[in-house]
Amino acid sequence: MSELTGEWKEVLSGEFKKPYYRSLYEFVKEEYSTHTVFPPADKIFEALHLTPLSKIKVVILGQDPYHTPGQAQGLAFSLPDDAPTQPSMRNILKELKDDLGIERTSQNLTNWAKQGVLLLNTSLTVEEGQPNGMADMWLPFTTRLIENLSKQDQTIIFVLWGKQAQKFAEFIDEKQPIISSA
């Protein structure tokens, strides 16, 4: 797993010392050495690398990375432009067009991340063909991350897409707006 720097390292450094995180780290390391896991190991924290904490305006929370080769990029819902369009991306593109009149052709959402949209999954890794298979291991870390985000001074809009993401509403401070949809 790649190292976090700056604001993220400061906010999460305490978590990295906790027993649950050591177990998570060892589990993920073992999974990468014995199975096909997505995204690539150097992209696990890509959402945090691309979106500085102080710049976050919106958190879009999904379930887990795409679980087939050549798709997961470390950003929830984002796909390489040459990848087959997945149902979730098809819905995003449709809603952009229908609701906002935006005709977006790129499936790569990196530009959103750089503009303050944290594209985060509740599980940051997934074994090939095993959707939500690593969710329990990631739950403590993702919970603490969401709690920390929701306690920031700035207003952050939390968009919870899917049943797994909606379970995280209870960890979001009441001062932060939540948009919850299936």
Predicted regions, residues:
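A polyanion-binding, active-site-adjacent surface
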Residues: 2-3, 14-160, 164-172, 179-181
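Short, contiguous pre-domain boundary segments
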Residues: 5-10
